[in-house]
Amino acid sequence: RLIDINSLEDREVPAIDALYIGGGFPETQAQALADNVAFRGALKQRIEEGLPVYAECGGLMYLGKALVVDGKEFPMVGALPLSLILEKKPQGHGYTVLEVTGKNPYYPVGEVLKGHEFHYSKAVLHPSDDTRTVFKVLRGEGMDGKIDGLCRKNVLATYTHIHAGGNPQWAGRVLRNKFSLDSK
C-alpha cells in the first residue's frame, strides 16, 4: 500500500516500511521545509533506526544538512553529511549513466544504471566515516562530474532519477531491503 506523506504539513512519519522521496525543487519551499522541525526530526530518527529510504534529486537535497538559497541557509533533515548550494544555472541536465561501485542496499556492485538529472544545486560533501559514495558517473554530472549516490545506513540518495524501464528491479529492491531487515 502506498501512503502520501507531506513534508510541509505532516508532523510525524506515519507507520511505513520504506520511503521513496522523489525529485522536485525543495528550494521553492525551503523556508516551509525548514520550519517543519517536528517532521524533519521524526524522519531523521526513523532513518537512524534503519528505515529504508531511496531518494532522488530533491529527495537528496532534503536529506542533507542544509540548503543554501540566495546566501541564506535553511536546515534540512540532516541525515546525510552534505550541504546543497543553489546556483543560478543548471549544475546537471540530461541523461545519466552510472556504474555501481560501492556496496549499498539496492544495487549490486558492477550494475549500470540509466536515468536523467536536472538540478541547480551543487553538493558540498562533509567528511563522514559512516557515509560513502556508491556510483561512478559515466555520463552526466552527478555530484561533481565523477561521483553520485550517497549511502548511509539504509539510505541511498542520488541526483539521478532512475528510469524505471531501464532499471525495472529498483522498486522491488527497496522492498526486498525492508524484508531482509525484518528477518535480521
Features from the language model and the residues they span:
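Glycine-rich, charged/polar anion/phosphate-binding loops
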Residues: L2-L8, L63-K65, E99-K103, G142-G145
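Amide-donor transfer/coupling interface in amidating biosynthetic enzymes
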Residues: L86-K184
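Acidic, glycine-rich loop-and-beta core segments that form the ion-binding/anion-interacting portion
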Residues: R1-L43
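Cysteine-nucleophile active-site neighborhood
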Residues: P26-Y106
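Generic hydrophobic alpha-helical scaffold/packing signal
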Residues: D17-Y20, A30, R40-I47, G64, ...
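Hydrophobic, well-ordered secondary-structure elements that form the walls
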Residues: L19, E56, V77, F118, ...
